[in-house]
Amino acid sequence: MKRIAAELGVSVTTVSKVLNHHADIGPATRARVLARVEELGYRPNAVARSLTLRRTHTLGVIIPDLMHSFFVEVVAGLEAIVSARGYGLLLCASGEDPKKERVALDMLRARQVDGMVLASATATSNTALLRDIAAQGTALVMIDRDDHPRVRCHRVLTDDVKVGRLATAHLVAAGRRAIAHIKGPPIAHSRRREQGYRDALAAARLRVREDRLVEGGFMEADGYRAMQALISLTPRVDGVFAVNDPAAVGAMKAIWDAGLRVPDDVSVVGAGDVAYSDLIRVPLTTVRWSKRDLGGRAAELILDQMDAGTTDRPRRVIIPPELIVRESA
């Protein structure tokens, strides 16, 4: 850095700020420094830099599934923002397993990442660990799932009650009256989507039959099993709101395997608008919210927190949902 500074007639501090993506350097100076850095093939020593700055310029991200298209889009939105500020991502998958989540949290803490973004595993028991991480000053943002209410951190979510209301109200508007709900695991956003389902039925003056609420899960196989149970009810259900799109797709397969038609016999609505929702035999009506915005807003919050060095006022950012009408309902 001293050589570059001397050649360009700027201070070593200026060169350092350019390399560390500080915003208080003018564009002309930044361009000159970066051009000379490129000419010299200069690469900062990451270990030395982290020791000097007390930052690793790495963020840890824990999501339930690295292959799930929903979370792929969330991470893409996150990465687009943080990479522009010189941060890299260290990705971990919990597999919806609290033990794996704990191992990932401990590993990220040992790696001294500057911050963590977490979509919590179902049935997680890691509240105490997360409170400890936040209390030690590691920037923490929770996305998509609103669990661990006692953990002081920013959160980026959708309005899950509205998700349930939009989906169920659409089934009511389509003339369906025996409307079932395939529930998710017992975590906050599943419960809120169920509440939206109940609210929409109440608004339509339709009675909630508890046998039409079947606990499923977030995967296709969960939706398939739940729908098999619902098909056996009398009178037969004529509409289904599934907690997410994979569960809805599984439900549709169970309907077809029973010799019934979607939407003629049973209408189906999902939630999440995953990548293949409009590519299946009967394109899926669903409720959508921007996954890239979810990741992007999480990135902005965690960068702001790291710059400020505190979370005096934890924020809840809500990404609004919207109904996407296709052919399944």
Model-identified regions with their sequence ranges:
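Amphipathic helical "hinge" segments at domain boundaries
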Residues: 27, 31, 40-118, 181, ...
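Bacterial carbohydrate/catabolite-sensing allosteric modules
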Residues: 39, 80-85, 109, 134-329
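N-terminal helix-turn-helix DNA-binding module of bacterial transcription factors
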Residues: 1-57, 329
